[in-house]
Amino acid sequence: MADTLRRLVNSSPYSVLQDKLDAWYKDYHVYSCDQNLNRCCELVELTSKIQGQLFTILNLTAQEGGHYSGVDTLKSRLLPWLGSCFTIAASAVSSDTSLSLIQESVEKDRKIRELSSVHESNLQKIEDQLCSTRIELDSVKRELVDTHIELDSTKNKSATTLLATEDEILHLKSELRVAQDQLDLYKRKLDVLDDYERQVRILRDEVSFLNAEKTVLQDRLARSRSPSPLLRRSRSVSPVRGESPTRAQLTSSSRHARLVSRFSDLYATERLESQSLLLKYIDDLETVQRILFIAAVESFQAAKLAYRQFKSRVRKTLSSTHIGPESLEDAVVDYIVRNLDLYDVQTSINDVINAMNVNPRISFPPEVDFVLISSFIREACRIAFAMQTLDPPLDLAFSSDGELYSDVKYRRSFDSEFTAPLVAFHVWPALLEGDTVILKGEAVTRRGALWKSRSRSSSPVRSRSGSPSRTFMASHSRSPSPGRLSSSRL
């Protein structure tokens, strides 16, 4: 009660009511009828609010006094006032009207209580629903937390699985590279094996030919030992030697197989030894491979030129003394086959080194000379010179940087781009017999090889006039011209 009374005092409603009365009184004649009625209704509403607060205080005060305290005061003061309120307009309102008003008031109170109970029940239901909703929300939050935990666990497992998969992929890639290297090695071994099988077939054919020739010669020898004079006369008219092939023709197959094998050994052994030697002075493997390839090509060119010159000198020497059933050309070739050691290989080595010194596609440190690989050049020249005595002679396939790669002529090197169509540079030339490739070469294929090969062509030409190796090579050169030989050697 004290709180309600304090609020009533603090709000000072009567002062507000007095101010509104004063304001209405001043402007009463100015306002219209509706405005004055609105002001009057406003004051009645304010008065009813104040009376409601006073009745609240009255109720609280009566409750504080107990069941019977203040009864006399209420009877003497409140009830007469209430009765006067109901009888103020007795002339206009009858007793039946007052009774109906009381009944309406009671009915309104009952409806208010019913609405209040309904409101409280609805409020209780809403609170229950709110509690259940909160419980469900808490469960959803817990499920969300569990889901987050499960998601984090799944992410960690996925990351672990991804790392393991990447490691496995890297391992498989490394195994694939190893398998590809082994495959390339096996392919090379297979090519070598094919070469060996070809050589074996050639040797078998040669053995068969020699056996047949041996049988023919034995028959002729038996006939030559016969005492019949007719046979002797026929032998003197048509000598047996005219039907016998030369030594070069008899050994052509075996020399062919041996020279092909020497060319393979030159690639597999001498080339790698020279490559290891050059890598001590040059860090670029590509430059070293270019040098050895050009050395092999220049060796064949120099050996073919030396063979033509040597053959011309032998033909000139033998032309004046040649007798016999075989042709002069066969005799010249047979002489060269029998005297391959007369080939002036040192002159060819000097020519190869001079050609390499002015080749624009390779460069070399000035403090080192190509004489380092003179043993490789010497073996290449000897093989090339001996190959010219075969029928048909063996030669190298034409090659140029930036050409279109051919599986028939070359094998790709291990560091090649296997989808590139052009040759960047050659590691080893292909060996031809006529137009047929009998030994594949090796090439490196890369994209943009044509532009790289053009850009390398502008390297400067080196001068070797002061190289000390030149005097060394010149001092060991010799001139085995067959003109200096006696007729007994021929």
UniProtKB/Swiss-Prot annotation:
Pfam families: MIEAP. GO terms for cellular component: cytoplasm; intracellular membrane-bounded organelle; mitochondrial matrix; mitochondrial outer membrane; mitochondrion. It comes from the Eukaryota. Residues 224-253, 455-490 are annotated as: Disordered. InterPro entries: MIEAP, MIEAP_C. It is found in: Cytoplasm; Mitochondrion outer membrane; Mitochondrion matrix. GO terms for biological process: mitochondrial protein catabolic process; mitophagy by internal vacuole formation; response to steroid hormone. GO terms for molecular function: cardiolipin binding. Its main location: cytoplasm. Residues 112-210 form a coiled coil. Residues 224-241, 456-490 have a biased composition (Low complexity). Keywords: Coiled coil, Cytoplasm, Lipid-binding, Membrane, Mitochondrion, Mitochondrion outer membrane. PANTHER family: MITOCHONDRIA-EATING PROTEIN, MITOCHONDRIA-EATING PROTEIN-RELATED. Belongs to the MIEAP family. Key regulator of mitochondrial quality that mediates the repairing or degradation of unhealthy mitochondria in response to mitochondrial damage. Mediator of mitochondrial protein catabolic process (also named MALM) by mediating the degradation of damaged proteins inside mitochondria by promoting the accumulation in the mitochondrial matrix of hydrolases that are characteristic of the lysosomal lumen. This is Mitochondria-eating protein. It comes from Danio rerio (Zebrafish).
